[in-house]
Amino acid sequence: MTWQIVFVVICVIVAGVAALFWRLPSDDTTRSRAKTVTIAAVAAAAVFFFLGCFTIVGTRQFAIMTTFGRPTGVSLNNGFHGKWPWQMTHPMDGAVQIDKYVKEGNTDQRITVRLGNQSTALADVSIRWQLKQAAAPELFQQYKTFDNVRVNLIERNLSVALNEVFAGFNPLDPRNLDVSPLPSLAKRAADILRQDVGGQVDIFDVNVPTIQYDQSTEDKINQLNQQRAQTSIALEAQRTAEAQAKANEILSRSISDDPNVVVQNCITAAINKGISPLGCWPGSSALPTIAVPGR
């Protein structure tokens, strides 16, 4: 019951009592005062009744209209609206909602999910959604308040959808170590959520930027990454050895085909070491000597 209708009832009662004193035989002063009170009470009741015939709905809000507590099935958008004084309006937020389930300080609101390897993890999740005005009366009848819609409709179904998609996700699968599967898993969760609650709310997107595994799974992932790194190093060493062997083979063939290659390599090495290159020519009796400074 609105406050206007309460004051209307009070004014009517006062007017009724004053009217009795006005109509009953009594002195002129009493009757005059009773008449004044009656007229004033009736006028006040009319004013309060008039004030109860209008309501204003705020920006980006819906208002659910009820008559004596029973929903009428009418939802009002933002603006100025007329109604009966005995009708009440209940606001519902019609703006786009951005809900984040993250860890901030000592408050941890992350969603627990069970993975394909039977371990559990904590997922950082954000979701953008908006209430549909056409579904607002039904949602009010089921959940009464907007916060109950968020907790019992959005959060509960979001948790169910995330657990459904993460049940098929194995964090130890090598394919999941190359490319993060979180964007595709979040998209699938959003699709499931749209199927479940899409008739009542608009689901714009679901995001899972990070996920924290339990310690056992984290250790196994680190071991896999170390093994993959060692394998990469071994493969690179193998390719280097193969390239070196091929280079040696090419060099060996070039020496056999052209002895001057040996002479050139000898001269280069002798010059680099400060040794005389005289002994590098085939058939030469000279021996390489070490240059003595100052002689």
Swiss-Prot record:
The chain crosses the membrane at residues 2-22, 37-57. GO terms for cellular component: extracellular region; plasma membrane. GO terms for biological process: proteolysis. It is a multi-pass membrane protein. One of its GO terms (molecular function) is peptidase activity. Protease that triggers late cell apoptosis and contributes to the pathogenicity and dissemination of M.tuberculosis. In a mouse model of infection, can induce hepatocyte and lung cell apoptosis and cause pathological damage to the spleen, liver and lungs. Specifically stimulates the secretion of inflammatory cytokines including TNF-alpha, IL-6 and IL-1 beta. Can degrade casein in vitro. This is Protease Rv3090. It comes from Mycobacterium tuberculosis (strain ATCC 25618 / H37Rv).
